[in-house]
């Protein structure tokens, strides 16, 4: 057991174990995404991340622009399976010449432990078309994060001395430290 003046439970994506009843009121879901590490058949000397129009309609900063509507319409017309599986191509180089390729988005209450091979095949096909060369996949994995709550994050006071902090988007690593600072200040005041 744990004892403390204040305890903050930081969830990650597990909304069904600790404080499940309090979490159920938020009606949260999770997102499971598939990722690949691949080697290109030729030296691409790629120095920066590569995004496509698929990414532009996935991220709100771009998707909310009026110009994105035409891109979204083309995707829905020509490749509805990409929209259905939340596939948007991101390619990031590693220092060793490999490429990190992703990703897909599968939303629900539970994350299947099994990847969909067809989703990987579509991402490989998109990457090869975009890069203009074949790639060899050397690793596959999935990520899971909390998603689609009542806002981008929640901070609940579950009981006296017990709080819960949850992210509902895939930006936890980016904004997590600021969220922690804000939540601690809410409990004890600014530093």
Predicted regions and their residues:
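A short catalytic or substrate-binding loop motif that flags glycine-/basic-rich loops and adjacent residues
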Residues: 28-30, 81-85, 147
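Central helical "cap/lid" subdomain
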Residues: 2-63, 133
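C-terminal catalytic lobe of FAD-dependent flavoproteins
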Residues: 85-88, 92-100, 106-191
């Amino acid at each position: 057991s744990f004892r403390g003046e204040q305890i903050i439970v930081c969830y990650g994506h597990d909304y069904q174990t600790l404080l499940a009843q309090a979490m159920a009121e938020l009606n949260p879901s999770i997102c499971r995404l598939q990722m690949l590490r691949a080697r290109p058949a030729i030296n691409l000397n790629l120095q920066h991340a590569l995004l496509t129009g698929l990414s532009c309609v996935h991220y709100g900063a771009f998707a909310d622009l009026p110009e994105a509507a035409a891109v979204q319409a083309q995707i829905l017309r020509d490749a509805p399976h990409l929209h259905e599986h939340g596939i948007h191509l991101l390619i990031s180089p590693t220092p060793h010449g490999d490429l990190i390729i992703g990703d897909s988005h599968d939303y629900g209450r539970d994350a299947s432990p099994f990847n969909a091979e067809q989703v990987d095949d579509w991402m490989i096909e998109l990457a090869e078309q975009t890069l203009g060369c074949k790639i060899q996949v050397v690793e596959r994995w999935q990520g899971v994060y909390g998603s689609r709550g009542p806002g981008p994050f929640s901070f609940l006071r579950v009981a006296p001395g017990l709080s819960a902090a949850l992210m509902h988007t895939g930006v936890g690593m980016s904004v997590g430290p600021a969220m922690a600072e804000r939540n601690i200040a809410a409990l004890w005041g600014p530093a």
